[in-house]
């Protein structure tokens, strides 16, 4: 009976450890995805802020050569 209890506790302990590791990896993956989304949004904002400068540069070139 004691052997069975020890075996059961060992199985439960190992199950909890593996579950904890999986949850930690899942949390890290979600954080990486969130960080990547934020990076993409900031790059998009930087690009969108350059559009007026590009348009004015093209317009001034068109006036100069046209």
UniProtKB/Swiss-Prot annotation:
Propeptide positions: 23-46
Keyword terms: Amidation, Amphibian defense peptide, Antibiotic, Antimicrobial, Cleavage on pair of basic residues, Cytolysis, Fungicide, Hemolysis, Immunity, Innate immunity, Membrane, Secreted, Signal, Target cell membrane, Target membrane
InterPro entries named in the record: Frog_antimicrobial_propeptide, FSAP
Signal peptide: 1-22
Record carries keyword Nucleotide-binding: no
Keyword Secreted in record: yes
Expression by tissue: Expressed by the skin glands.
Family membership: Belongs to the frog skin active peptide (FSAP) family. Phylloseptin subfamily.
Function of the molecule: Antimicrobial peptide with high activity against Gram-positive bacteria, moderate activity against Gram-negative bacteria, and moderate activity against fungi. Acts by causing bacterial membrane disruption inducing leakage of the intracellular content followed by cell death. It adopts an alpha-helical amphipathic structure in membrane environments. Also shows highly potent antiparasitic activity against Leishmania species. Shows moderate hemolytic activity on human erythrocytes (LC(50)=25 uM). Is also active on human monocytes (IC(50)=22.5 uM).
This protein's name: Phylloseptin-S2
Origin species: Phyllomedusa sauvagei
């Amino acid at each position: 009976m004691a052997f069975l209890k020890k075996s059961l506790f060992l199985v439960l302990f190992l199950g909890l450890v593996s579950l904890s590791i999986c949850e930690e990896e899942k949390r890290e993956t979600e954080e990486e995805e969130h960080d990547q989304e934020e990076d993409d949004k900031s790059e998009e904002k930087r690009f969108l802020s350059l559009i007026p400068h590009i348009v004015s540069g093209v317009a001034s070139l068109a006036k100069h050569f046209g």
